[in-house]
Structures are given as structure tokens and as C-alpha cells.
Amino acid sequence: MAQGQQPIFILPQDTSRYVGREAQRINILAGKVLAETVRTTLGPKGMDKMLVDSLGDIVITNDGVTILREMDISHPAAKMLVEVAKTQEDEVGDGTTTAVIIAGELLKEAEKLIEMGVHPTIIALGYRNAALKAQEILEEISMEASDRDTLMKVAITAMTGKGSERAKEKLAELVVDAVMQVEEDGEIDKDNINIQRIQGASVNESRIVNGIVIDKSRADTSMPKRIEKARIALLKYPIEVKDLETDAKIRLTDPSQMQAFIEQEEQMIRDMVEKIKSSGANVVFCQKGIDDLALHYLSREGIMALKRVKKSDIKRIEKATGARLVTNIDDLTAEDLGEAGVIYEKKIFDEVLTFIEECRDPKAISIILRGSTKHVAEEMERALEDAIGVVASTLEDREVVAGGGAPEVEIARKLREYADTISGREQLAVSAFADALEIVPKTLAENAGLDSIDVLVDLRAAHEESPYMGIDVFDGNIVDMKEAGVIEPQRVKKQAIQSAAEAAEMILRIDDMIAARGFDVSSKDEEDMEGMGGMGGMPPMM
């Protein structure tokens, strides 16, 4: 700049900025810290985290996505890895911790290459090619899953180490039965399996319901508490007189007009109840409100009614009973009604529930999940949701892989062979990708109190003979995971590797960060960030 010229500012005052290597270093640091946070939770011997929010509410879990969701993370690069975990949870239901620690390790390996002088673009290209090759290798080592026994093994593997050890076989039975029941044309909608979590009893008292359970009671205590041979009407229409949609006013000039007006309203409600009765319905689930007078008339007709039922519950009742949701009560006919053998209200512990049972081939069902305390029941529910996700994935794809770190070691071994066929610096990136994948067996060993280096060396040697060799964290031996029954859906590994690679690639391609005013911390916080302080913000952009 020539002498005497004024500097030109193109960004608002107090905006912070990092450029080039500094931006990459900060983002990689954030990714590594986040991965280290959840790393200790991986595997059957993984530890739990206690998360306490500003209100003092406690969550105790080793579920990766739950930990990341509950943490107050605002660092942009760390948020990208949280999205990886959420995507993994939505797509598969398990493997969230695996996805995050692989992404963190990919960034760690990339940092070494950047320090060696390898350009981030070359690393990103190498990672992309390595991820594609990893998917091919995964297909080669996958096994076909076609029977109930395989589904049981998948469910048990998913729940091992998640607080459900004492009853994992029983819970696996419930999960497999539930998923197989709701399957339609080879597809499973996990929303059709409803888990009702109730504390106050042993997990062994959990059971599956051949129908739906909703956490609602009768709209009026004078209504029947139990209905046999239920004929079910589902209404989106409120059973009450609608308010005027305009600001129009009704002017009454004498008391008789007021009386006529009231009588007219009552007649409209009587007509609605009569419409329900004439359709043959003896149970009504209404998504909207029900007028007190309507409740009186329904009760007098011996009809059970529940009001303000959640939309998700209405959908499940449709799937379970064959009922059709009616948006206008005048259109309600006998053809719209669903059927159930019995509907009854029951109080369990401190919750009043309505059971819709003995449904004919229901495509939506409920699981009553018990737990001795609130926190135990919550962790059981997370384990059950993971198991439902992996069993559904297995049933849809019919492809599984061995567990215990076996797929990662085998993919890493073959990626190194693939790297030898590539020339240039991209070869280093593919080799780094292979090294990063071995973080999974290393972490499994560390969390079990074993020597990770010895375990990894033994695993590599064992994989010269078989691709199914993995680590048995309970006795520390290298065993055939296929024979041991430790198996996972192929989709879990596929999604984890793909998501981790894409997230790492995206972070590596960032060479400029501009933070708005107020989104900044002092440089001394960078040391805190290494120990998980400072994850709420970004180090300064000089």
C-alpha cells in the first residue's frame, strides 16, 4: 500500500478471521476434541457420560448421538461432526460413535500430511477415492442375512454394553418380533414401533403389545373403561361447535333468542354424536378437542372417547386397526372404522395408558419397556431404539458384516494394498485413510483395558488368514466374530465410513473462516479446548 493511503476495510469492525493453515488447524483441532469426547463410550466395555443441563436435569448414557445432542456445541467444524452422528442415527440407528471417531481420526491423519507439505486438496481427493474403495471391500466381506437367528445376533450385538446386559436376549426377542411384524413389502418404518417407557419394575417385565399403547386416558371418567370387540373411529374434526372464523357479532334482542341459540348449539353437538353412533363406532380417537356436552352424550351411549390424541399415535392406530382418519364428521361411515379385540385403560406405575389389543395383523405395534428407575429406563430405550434400527436395516438389506473391529482391519489391510497401486502424494492420503480406520479396534481394546498396540498387531496377523477376525473385549482374545455371533448390518459400517470421509473432506477444504462479531474467544482458551473446555466457541481469528 502506497504511503499515505488509508487501509480499506471490507468486513465489519470486530469481525474475526483465520486464513490458510491456521483455519485448517483450528477446524482439525475441533474435530479431534469432539472425537476424543465420545471415544471412551465405544464398544461393550465403553464408559458412560453424565450430562447435566442448566436446569439440573441429568442424562446418563454412552450413546454417541445423545451425548452430542445434549452438549452445547457451537464451534462450526464440531457442529459438522454432530451432523454426521445425527445422519447416522436417522439412516441406520446405530454406529454414531464409530462415525464420529473415524471422522476425527481422518482429520488427525490429515494434519500429519499437511505438516509434511501435502496439499489439503490432494488429501481430500485421496480420502474420496479411499472411501469408494472401502465400500467395494465392504461388499466383498459382507455375509448374507436371511434368518431370524441372524436378526437376533444383530440385535444383541447392538445392545451389548448399553445398560441392557441383564435382559438383552429378552429385549432382542421383542425387537425382532416387532420389526418383523411391521415389515411391509420389504420395508420397515421405524415410526410404526412405539416404545412406551415406564419405570418402577425390572426390565424383564417388558413386553410386546399386539396393537398400540397410547399415553392417554378416557376423556371422561363416566365412559366405559373397557370395550370388547371395539369399532374404532379416528377423527381429525373437533366434536364441538366451531368458533366463528370472522369478527362478526351476533346481536340478540330478547332472552328467547339466547335460548334458541343455545339449543341450536346443543342440537349440533347431539347430531355429531348421533353420527358417530350410527356409524357403529364404540370407541373414538379425536385429534382435536371434544366439548363437555359431547362427552356427556358419548358417555350415555356407552362410547369410549379420547381427545387431543397425537398425530403420530393416530397414524399408528390407522396401521394397527385398519381405521381411516376422517376429516369431516359428516363423512364418517362404517367403512372408515377400524377393529380391535379389546380396548381398555390401565394404570402402570404412575402412568395411565390406553391399550388397543388383539388387532388383526397390525402393521404398527407398541413395546412396553420397564426399568427400575427413570435413568435406567431412558438408557434402555436408547438401546432398544438402536436395536430396532439395526434389525430393520438388516431385514431390508439382507447384508451383515462381522463386528469387533474386523471390517475396519480388513478394509485397512486392503486399502494399503490399493495404495501401492497409486502413484504420487495421493498414495499417502489413501494410506492415512487406512490408518484412520484402525482407530475402531484400537479404541475397543483401550476401552477394555487391553494394550491397543499388541491387539492391533495380532489382528493384522489374523487377517492374513480370515477377514472375520475381531477382538473379544471380554477375554482379550482374537476370535472369529462370525462364529462368535458378533455381527452388525453392512449399512452401519457403510454409512459411518461414507459420512466420516465426506465430513473430513469438507472440513479439509476450508481455508478461510470469518466469524461474526461476538463469536470469538481469547487465544488462551485454545489450551482449554484440548481438554474439552472452549468447545462452545472458536479460537480467535487474527
Swiss-Prot record:
GO molecular function: ATP binding; ATP hydrolysis activity; ATP-dependent protein folding chaperone; unfolded protein binding
Keyword field: ATP-binding, Chaperone, Nucleotide-binding
Record CDD domains: cpn60
Xref: InterPro entries: Chaperone_TCP-1, Chaperonin_TCP-1_CS, Cpn60/GroEL/TCP-1, GroEL-like_apical_dom_sf, GROEL-like_equatorial_sf, TCP-1-like_intermed_sf, TCP-1_chaperonin, thermosome_alpha
Xref: SUPFAM superfamilies: GroEL apical domain-like, GroEL equatorial domain-like, GroEL-intermediate domain like
Pfam families: Cpn60_TCP1
Source domain of life: Archaea
Function text: Molecular chaperone; binds unfolded polypeptides in vitro, and has a weak ATPase activity.
Quaternary context: Forms a Heterooligomeric complex of two stacked eight-membered rings.
Assigned protein family: Belongs to the TCP-1 chaperonin family.
Record-given protein name: Thermosome subunit alpha
